[in-house]
């Protein structure tokens, strides 16, 4: 009797747990008796993955927090490597968390265990030398975006574009009224969303600029109301204090979380760069991307970052389809000037481009990822 297929997985944070859940579901179609084990969160565990360590043991944010748990994290990494070397899985899949997973993948591959890295690190943007470690550590990289695969192809590193899970989740036709109803917003309200980031340092720098920009827009377009999702109570308190100082009369409604619904409710959005820009594109919301960091971070980033654009919509399109205002260009005057053409217009050209890009990256990523695992197991890439 054949032994069931054994698949090792490591997710390092909540987003990886969601990806792992979808991947396990899709793999069960191919291998209904497969055994899954590794580092998992509640969603992966619910799909039958045995957690040798809980995801929470790795899920830390910030330099100081990582330092505080570094000893524990390194011990976990050593134990998981030793476990998989002693009990080799048929394949190992590291989900995101490259600082942790690439070392695991490298050690396992040295012991002839097949390895896949799911979610490309941003090597195309900065620290491009990491591509050589990735090449040694993995049999295949699974990339969400087409320009990522193009980068790997330049270095002859096996990579497969599988589409983006977020593009699978969001409908091609936006559901604005449904989103507004879920938030208790008026169906016919004119709404500008503001997303100044989720980290304290981001909100500290961008909050005042975004609020002053909104205040100026409010004077020019008095029909508009402003909606903001804040990731937690601390960021909400931070923004409210900034509002009292910079825009006390602004008609502002703050939501606890619910960033997706806020984005989908908006007629336009002002946001910091990051995944939010991709989500706004998929929600078909015209946007301005504005970003500013402290001077030292900017100087270091300018030396390291090797891309023309900072926002994912522009990177996917390989041209500027949304306005980007970074660092010295991130001013109230520039933001207002960039937002004005988006307000009260149908923006059909931008929205049609968003639809085209949505279709490009809407590929049923869970199914594609599972098929990639099957192909590597069968020595096809």
From Swiss-Prot:
SUPFAM superfamilies: UDP-Glycosyltransferase/glycogen phosphorylase (SSF53756)
Enzyme class, broadest EC rank: transferase
Pfam families: LpxB (PF02684)
Keyword Lipid biosynthesis in record: yes
GO cellular component: membrane
Molecular-function GO term, any one: lipid-A-disaccharide synthase activity
Keywords recorded for this protein, A-Z: Glycosyltransferase, Lipid A biosynthesis, Lipid biosynthesis, Lipid metabolism, Transferase
Documented EC number(s): 2.4.1.182
Catalysed reaction, written as an equation: a lipid X + a UDP-2-N,3-O-bis[(3R)-3-hydroxyacyl]-alpha-D-glucosamine = a lipid A disaccharide + UDP + H(+)
Highest taxon above the source species: Bacteria
Pathway: Bacterial outer membrane biogenesis; LPS lipid A biosynthesis
This protein's record includes keyword Transferase: yes
GO terms for biological process, alphabetical: lipid A biosynthetic process
NCBIfam families according to UniProt: lpxB
Role noted for this protein: Condensation of UDP-2,3-diacylglucosamine and 2,3-diacylglucosamine-1-phosphate to form lipid A disaccharide, a precursor of lipid A, a phosphorylated glycolipid that anchors the lipopolysaccharide to the outer membrane of the cell.
Family: Belongs to the LpxB family.
Protein name: Lipid-A-disaccharide synthase
Organism: Psychromonas ingrahamii (strain DSM 17664 / CCUG 51855 / 37)
């Amino acid at each position: 009797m054949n032994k069931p297929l054994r698949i090792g997985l490591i997710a390092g944070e909540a987003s990886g747990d969601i990806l792992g859940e979808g991947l396990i579901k899709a793999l069960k179609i191919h291998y209904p008796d497969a055994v899954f084990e590794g580092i998992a969160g509640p969603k992966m565990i619910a799909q039958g993955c045995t957690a040798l360590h809980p995801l929470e043991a790795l899920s830390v944010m910030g330099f100081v927090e990582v330092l505080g748990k570094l000893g524990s994290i390194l011990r976990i990494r050593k134990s998981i490597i030793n476990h998989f070397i002693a009990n080799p899985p048929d394949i190992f899949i590291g989900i995101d968390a490259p600082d942790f997973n690439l070392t695991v993948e490298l050690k396992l591959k040295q012991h002839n265990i097949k390895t896949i890295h799911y979610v490309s690190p941003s090597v195309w943007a900065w620290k491009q030398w990491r591509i050589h470690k990735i090449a040694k550590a993995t049999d295949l990289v699974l990339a969400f975006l087409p320009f990522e695969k193009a980068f790997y192809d330049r270095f002859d590193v096996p990579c497969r574009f599988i589409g983006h899970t977020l593009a699978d989740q969001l409908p091609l036709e936006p559901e604005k009224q449904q989103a507004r109803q879920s938030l208790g917003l008026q169906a016919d309200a004119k709404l500008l969303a503001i997303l100044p980031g989720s980290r304290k340092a981001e909100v500290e720098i961008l909050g005042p600029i975004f609020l002053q920009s909104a205040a100026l827009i409010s004077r020019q377009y008095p029909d508009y109301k402003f909606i903001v999702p804040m990731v937690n109570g601390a960021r909400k308190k931070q923004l409210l204090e900034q509002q009292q100082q910079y825009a006390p009369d602004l008609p502002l409604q703050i939501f606890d979380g619910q960033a997706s619904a806020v984005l989908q409710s908006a007629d336009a959005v002002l946001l910091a760069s990051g995944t939010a820009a991709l989500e706004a594109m998929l929600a078909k919301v015209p946007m301005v991307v504005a970003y500013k960091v402290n001077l030292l971070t900017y100087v270091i980033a300018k030396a390291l970052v090797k891309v023309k654009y900072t926002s994912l919509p522009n990177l996917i399109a390989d041209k500027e389809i949304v306005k980007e205002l970074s660092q010295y260009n991130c001013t109230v005057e520039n933001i207002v000037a960039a937002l004005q053409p988006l307000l009260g217009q149908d923006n059909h050209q931008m929205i049609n481009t968003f639809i085209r890009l949505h279709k490009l990256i809407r590929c049923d990523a869970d199914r594609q990822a599972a098929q990639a695992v099957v192909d590597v197991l069968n020595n096809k890439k």
